Amino acid sequence: MNPVRKKRLIIVLAIVVGVGAAVGLALSALQQNINLFYTPTQIANGEAPTDTRIRAGGLVEKGSLQRSEDSLNVRFVVTDGAKEVTIAYHGILPDLFREGQGIVALGKLGGDGVLVADEVLAKHDENYMPPEVTKALKDSGQLKHYENGKAAGETSYNQEGK
């Protein structure tokens, strides 16, 4: 093989290896940032993976909010109308978090079926509900019940009355 051809081959191989490494790193980064959404029904049926970061959403069950008196630990139940999942969270809940409202929690599902959340997202005004939660409620037939309660002027408050 002549020197010019050998040099071109080395350059082409270096480019292929570089592009392959870049694609591999990009795919690895994207895979780590994927958070799949699961409804309480899917979680209760065992469809959600354990020890993997997931998103779970639904309506906060009325009367389910339990706050620790000596720490920022909070437990509450989220439902899609059919099944429920308990969520444990350590931190300050969003100002718009209320029982009976739609939320999305990000965290890892433990073997006991409790989602240990590291982030809780609440709807940002009275007319907004996360798209995943809306779809889950629509699929379970609970969206009409939720909308009827809002139309009748029903409001829900957390334990602090906010």
Curated annotation (Swiss-Prot):
Residues 139-148 have a biased composition (Basic and acidic residues). It is found in: Cell inner membrane. It is a single-pass type II membrane protein. Residues 30-162 are periplasmic. Residues 1-8 are cytoplasmic. Residues 139-162 are annotated as: Disordered. It comes from the Bacteria. The chain crosses the membrane at residues 9-29. GO terms for biological process: cytochrome complex assembly. GO terms for molecular function: heme binding; metal ion binding. SUPFAM superfamilies: Heme chaperone CcmE (SSF82093). One of its GO terms (cellular component) is plasma membrane. Heme binds at residues 124, 128. Keywords: Cell inner membrane, Cell membrane, Cytochrome c-type biogenesis, Heme, Iron, Membrane, Metal-binding, Signal-anchor, Transmembrane, Transmembrane helix. Belongs to the CcmE/CycJ family. PANTHER family: CYTOCHROME C-TYPE BIOGENESIS PROTEIN CCME HOMOLOG, MITOCHONDRIAL (PTHR34128:SF2). Heme chaperone required for the biogenesis of c-type cytochromes. Transiently binds heme delivered by CcmC and transfers the heme to apo-cytochromes in a process facilitated by CcmF and CcmH. This is Cytochrome c-type biogenesis protein CcmE.
